[in-house]
Amino acid sequence: MAALRVSRLSWTSSRITANTRLGDGELVDIQREVKLGGSIHSKGVLILASFLASRYAAEQPLSLGASLVFEQTYGQVEGDSASVAELCALLSSLANAPIRQSLAVTGSVDQFGRVQAIGAVNEKIEGY
């Protein structure tokens, strides 16, 4: 399991955890499964799954199962600004390499693994 604290657009921060294991290539978005993930957030997780599959399963099926969750978040999660943090948490879990909890991360990732430009920078910094 890997954990990473992420600064959300609002005035709070959240802890994202990832769990990886042997599996069939499925990336479970727990927020979506319990109907707490909005469509843009779900799109971001699907993009992560596409990136992981293209990077690590180009020649053979991905024998990995993974899950992602915003810990102790009970309201709707929306937007793709946490996808960099989610990717970091997944890679941390895969490598069994903990991430320092003093870091704040925001931003989205495209399906090629490239970090994209972020918006509302001032609000995110002030909110953290």
Q: What label would you give each PLM region?
A:
Residues 1-7:
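Catalytic or ion-coupling anion/metal-binding cores of large enzyme and transporter domains
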Residues 1, 14-128:
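Peripheral, non-AAA+ core regions of ATP-driven protein-machinery
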Residues 9-13:
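Short, flexible loop/turn motifs enriched in small residues
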